[in-house]
Amino acid sequence: MTTAAELRAESARLLAAKGGNSQGLVPTMGALHSGHAALARTAVAENDVVVATIFVNPLQFGDAVDLDRYPRTLDADMALLDAEGVDLVFAPSVDEVYPGGQPLVRVTSGPLGEKWEGASRPGHFDGALTVVAKLLHYGLPGGAAADGTTAAYRAYFGQKDAQQLALVKRMVSDLNFPVEIIPVPIVRSEDGLALSSRNRFLSDAERDAALVLSRALRLIESRANAHEPLHLDSAVALVESQPLVELDYFDVVDPATLEPLAENCKETPFRGEGLAIIAAKVGAVRLIDNAPLFS
């Protein structure tokens, strides 16, 4: 489907036909991989009707070259979603999502969106939140639940994009969107690399080099699990020892606010909860990763 009107009508029809009580939404930009399959699989297991969206959002790309380079693999994406049992796929045009050109009114990410990825990619999260807000509206259940009440509505996001996930949760809370945000854990290859649509652009040597990101995260994670000081500087040194990797940031933050934990939390035995976050360029490819910390 390519129009919001079609999506609304078909989701209402399906919800009624199935006697369903819930609808799930899986927003994507396409170029799907096993991580997206996990999102779809989780949504299908938890909802009566599942909608996936495929839309490469121009508002969140600061570089037109990066936008043009982003892979478009619609046929393969549709096959993956069908295999996971997704009911409806919404793949709108840019004109459908932004009729008349770029929107004059947008969702702004505020201070939470200006740090980390936001500092490296100014305006990225304003564009991302604007399209997520629209997709959440498009994906609203088109009809009532079988028992006549409002159908439950859930949207599924990967934990790899930790800052985006935190911002979407905050937007939904602050603006009273009638949807529950469900985080889905990071999916990794057997050697530990977090799955990403951008991994296809890595050479063999760059892919090997990129493994240092997950190794550094595992080092911090093992120290947290053992209630040891995190000694972040040694993990940073590990990443910086790889010549093909240019580190942007590596820190341990509060999972909700993304504020860095106090320095004494990193140099004394770790207690509590945190999130280790990392971003780096490997060759020309920017990669992000993270690891939840508990003790």
Swiss-Prot record:
Pfam families given in the database record: Pantoate_ligase (PF02569)
Residues that coordinate or bind ATP: 29-36, 158-161, 187, 195-198
SUPFAM superfamilies (UniProt xref): Nucleotidylyl transferase
Disulfides per UniProt: none
Positions bound to beta-alanine: Q60
Pathway participation: Cofactor biosynthesis; (R)-pantothenate biosynthesis; (R)-pantothenate from (R)-pantoate and beta-alanine: step 1/1
Keyword Calcium attached: no
Name assigned to this protein: Pantothenate synthetase
Organism: Paenarthrobacter aurescens (strain TC1)
Phylogenetic lineage: Bacteria, Bacillati, Actinomycetota, Actinomycetes, Micrococcales
